Swiss-Prot record:
Keyword Phosphoprotein appears in the UniProt entry: no
Name of the protein this chain belongs to: Activator of 90 kDa heat shock protein ATPase homolog 2
Pfam families xref list: Aha1_N (PF09229)
Cystine crosslinks: none
Stored InterPro entries: Aha1 (IPR036338), AHSA1-like_N (IPR015310), START-like_dom_sf (IPR023393)
Keywords: Chaperone, Stress response
Cited PANTHER family: ACTIVATOR OF 90 KDA HEAT SHOCK PROTEIN ATPASE HOMOLOG 2-RELATED, HEAT SHOCK PROTEIN 90 HSP90 CO-CHAPERONE AHA-1
């Protein structure tokens, strides 16, 4: 016998959550007949279709014969189901108010055929009312097949819950994934606290202007409010003293006068 952790990887030598028939590895079968009958009744009875000619409703599940089961073998699920279903429907013609009844028969719902290929036969009792029969053959049949598809989805998901149990390695892997997701969430939360924005590089700009005039005249141009306003052709703010405000163009920001 191989020691723990040794041997061909195809050998099943590992600790499992359950002890007997580990992870249902050997053949395990669960009867789904009773569950299926109840689910088929829930999904099929009450289906309604209507158009401008009339309205029809599946009123009862007259017969459901057959069986269904789900088997587990080496971690794989195998489904078996075979049903013969008869449904009763009733309808009313809008114009005349006449009421009619009929049957829907599904002779063979099994895993051998796709739901869209499943035979659905619609019949009606003698008399008028073929427009209701046609309604059930078209829209009614489509809704019946849709309900059968919902039954098969439920059989393969809801009914099989717990049939394949996780191994110890799978459980540890799931725990690692959850831990990584939690760590990623914490990192995202931490990074979200950092102030958002884009750092823009800036430089200092120094400019020198040469004025071809006398110093006294240049001084007056920048210290006499009337001369500043004539130069800028706009109102100006001028306080010719240390710390005073100087604003030559109104749309620019004011500056403070410093010693030169």
């Amino acid at each position: 016998m191989a020691k723990w952790g040794q041997g061909d990887p195809r050998w099943i030598v590992e600790e499992r959550e359950d002890g007997t028939n580990v992870n249902n590895w050997h053949w395990t079968e669960r009867d789904a007949t009773s569950w299926s009958k109840g689910r088929l009744r829930e999904l099929l009875v009450g289906i309604t279709v209507e158009n401008e000619a009339g309205r029809c409703e599946i009123s009862e599940l007259k017969q459901v014969e057959g069986e269904a089961s789900c088997s587990s073998r080496k971690g794989k699920l195998i489904f078996f189901y075979e049903w013969n279903i008869k449904l009763g429907w009733k309808g009313i013609i809008r114009e005349s108010g006449a009421k009619h009844k009929g049957l829907i028969e599904i002779p063979s719902l099994s895993e051998e055929n796709e739901v869209d290929d499943t035979e659905v036969n619609v019949s009606k009792k003698k008399g008028d009312g073929d427009i209701l029969k046609d309604l059930m053959k078209t829209a009614g049949t489509a809704k019946v097949r849709e309900a059968l598809g919902d039954y098969l989805k439920a059989l393969k998901t809801e009914f099989t819950m717990g049939m394949i149990l996780p191994t110890k390695a799978m459980a540890a892997q799931e725990l690692t994934v959850e831990r990584k997701l939690s760590e990623n969430a914490l990192q995202i939360q931490a990074s979200s606290r950092v102030a958002l924005g884009v750092r823009i590089p800036t430089v200092a700009l120094h400019m020198t202007e040469l004025f071809d005039t006398a110093i006294e005249q240049l001084y007056r141009i920048f210290t006499v409010k009337d001369l500043v306003q004539k130069f800028s052709k706009s109102p100006a703010v001028l306080e010719a003293e240390k710390g005073g405000k100087f604003q030559m163009l109104m749309e620019t920001s004011p500056v403070n006068i410093q010693n030169c």
